[in-house]
Amino acid sequence: QGLAGRVTYGFDKRYLFEANFGYNGSENFAPGKRWGFFPSAAAGWVISNESFWDGIRKTVSNLKIRVSYGLAGNDALGERFPYRSIVAMGEESGFYYNWNSQGKGPKITTYGNPNATWEEAKKLDVGLELGLFNALNIEAAYFTEDRTGIFMRRTSLPSSTGLLGVTPYGNIGRVKSHGVDLSAVYNKQFNKDWSLSLRGTFTFSRNEVVEKDEGDLMYDYMSVVGHPVNAITGVLVADGLFTSQEEIDNSPKQQFGNYTVGDIKYRD
């Protein structure tokens, strides 16, 4: 279920505006959590269509700046109906009827979260379009995304919750990302039989985990917060180099191979 709308406006091929909205419902969520409102807006200014551009239009054939900002939603959180618990039959051990048999019963393998709802992403895009000599077209864009409410399993819960062994999922994660997109296209018609077309693209992006339920970590370097998504953390941390045999003898023993003066000294 959903409702969508769009309004566009352009004035004299110079000033452009567009607004969109989506009001979407998803059966994946419990009643009261199913609907999300996701608006967006964009504006553009074609500077090269201004009258003051006439003197350089043969050289700079197109110049346009644009910006857009909006909110997007995601209801594909993995398993469907995350607000419902999943029960497996014959999984939980019971008591012995005799020495050779054991009772089995139902077991909750996933606790449903009635507050599960949409993941949301705030997206910003700022771009520039440049045309030179009616042959070379360059586009550059800078973009950011702030994704909140990422649906993930909690690491730990207090024993007072009574949910030992299986921790529930929740909209508890947050990731920020940013980057640039560049593209260039060159088209040249030499005559009716010969033409040249070249295209190049470049993309750079980075992301960072901002919020994640990690529980109590023994050391700060084991945390994924502040690192890119899927970064390897919690591994060995170098603490300099061994400078003498005396330092090796007085340091905790490293269990992964032989080492000597000049080798890496790992933090205990």
Residue ranges: model-predicted function:
Residues 243-245, 268:
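Alpha-helix N-cap recognition
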Residues 250-252, 268:
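Acidic, glycine-anchored loop motifs typical of Ca2+
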Residues 235-236, 241-243:
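C-terminal segments of large proteins
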Residues 245-247, 254:
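Core catalytic ATP-binding domain of two-component histidine kinases
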Residues 1-236:
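Extracellular/periplasmic, surface-exposed regions of secreted and cell-surface proteins
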Residues 1, 260-268:
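Short, intrinsically disordered, charge-balanced linker/junction segments flanking boundaries
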